[in-house]
Amino acid sequence: SVGFKAGVKDYKLTYYTPDYKTKDTDILAAFRVTPQPGVPPEEAGAAVAAESSTGTWTTVWTDGLTSLDRYKGRCYHIEPVAGEESQFIAYVAYPLDLFEEGSVTNMFTSIVGNVFGFKALRALRLEDLRIPNAYVKTFQGPPHGIQVERDKLNKYGRPLLGCTIKPKLGLSAKNYGRAVYECLRGGLDFTKDDENVNSQPFMRWRDRFLFCAEALYKAQAETGEIKGHYLNATAGTCEEMIKRAVFARELGVPIVMHDYLTGGFTANTTLAHYCRDNGLLLHIHRAMHAVIDRQKNHGMHFRVLAKALRLSGGDHIHSGTVVGKLEGEREITLGFVDLLRDDFVEKDRSRGIYFTQDWVSLPGVLPVASGGIHVWHMPALTEIFGDDSVLQFGGGTLGHPWGNAPGAVANRVALEACVQARNEGRDLASEGNQIIREASKWSPELAAACEVWKE
């Protein structure tokens, strides 16, 4: 017959290719697919590959004007999920040509843009991505990375300490700056704007930036250490965001901050480029991540958002605390913590890593442990996260019965005690509480903190 064969045809005829050998330049995705009852897994997997690449619901004559074989996504492997009924991991390979260079935005629009509302699927979750070297190389990545940050701050051989200034909303700029000064003076390396502190009626951004810079320089002069405050540059428009970053640079401060999910990847990459060009470190907060990553069977795993951030650019990113949670969660969290810091990460399903990822010397990102932690957690945090991390104690500093500066002292003493004990070969996991107790004998600030938050 003349012409093409019109009509709706099964996706799996075109997009399910179990014999396909993946290319080094392909972007690989692992999806957790929950098909609707009656939809075979091959069809569901193929549908995901089709809808997130070249497919549409019916055959169109313009298909003849291009080479589908060159541009289509392919579902190349499907495996059932152990212990789950009717859940499958579908592996999809995308040819590199489908993506714009250096654009996380375009990568996500393609891979997760449309397909999550697909009728044949009950639920869909993107578990992991393998970014090929050829694509990684089109990104600048983190503005500076772990080593450059240590050199800028002159801080080595230990995790860095931070604190989010609370109450997060309602303080005037001057009182806010005062809290910043007290924490830094007490011994923290960083203080932090809360993620929702942008520029509100009770405290406009410019006033906050000025008072925080003043606090920072005063604390720096008195302690002889380099200090930082994450000035949140997140704003309603990219122009306004850059304006704030420029002002931060003019004040000479070391670091600014961005909410990368609410701000969006385009804004984040823009800011990351500015930060590298102007010597600013960039702290990233993950506000809104749970909207995307909390459901076990739908959405995107945080390790994908973390990989995307390393491409887009950031020097620190919040990544959970691990402490006091389930053992399994610890392995998974350490999996994406390594994906943030290391140059090369092996596939390891027990840690949730579906693909071997080579970052081809893209700088690393410091993971930030933040939320509900206090001095008794210090040994565990030091052991789990190691030196290349930022430990943030908000309430764990400001909640100290004697005030902010003693709270900061308590945290710094606890950290130094843990690092020293570890370097002497002691086991932080089993002797942690004892190490803290010994240290509190000669630090009244730490002793008071130990009283407030029981082990």
Curated annotation (Swiss-Prot):
For this protein, what is the EC number?
Answer: 4.1.1.39
GO CC, sorted alphabetically, is: chloroplast
Provide the GO biological process annotations: photorespiration; reductive pentose-phosphate cycle
Where, per the database record, does this protein carry N6,N6,N6-trimethyllysine? 5
Question: Per its UniProt entry, what is the enzyme's top EC class, as one word?
Answer: lyase
Compartments annotated for it: namely:
Plastid, Chloroplast
A single MF term (Gene Ontology): ribulose-bisphosphate carboxylase activity
* Keywords associated with the record: Calvin cycle, Carbon dioxide fixation, Chloroplast, Disulfide bond, Lyase, Magnesium, Metal-binding, Methylation, Monooxygenase, Oxidoreductase, Photorespiration, Photosynthesis, Plastid
Q: State the superkingdom.
A: Eukaryota
What positions are marked as the site Transition state stabilizer?
325
The positions making up the signal sequence are: none
Kindly list the positions annotated as binding Mg(2+).
Answer: 192, 194-195
Which InterPro entries does the UniProt record give?
Answer: RuBisCO, RuBisCo_large_chain_AS, RuBisCO_lsu_C, RuBisCO_lsu_C_sf, RuBisCO_lsu_fd_N, RuBisCO_lsu_N_sf, RuBisCO_lsuI
Residues that bind substrate: 114, 164, 168, 286, 318, 370
Under the subunit heading, UniProt states:
Heterohexadecamer of 8 large chains and 8 small chains; disulfide-linked. The disulfide link is formed within the large subunit homodimers.
Protein name in the entry: Ribulose bisphosphate carboxylase large chain
Q: From which lineage does this chain's organism come? A: Eukaryota, Viridiplantae, Streptophyta, Embryophyta, Tracheophyta
Name of the encoding gene: rbcL
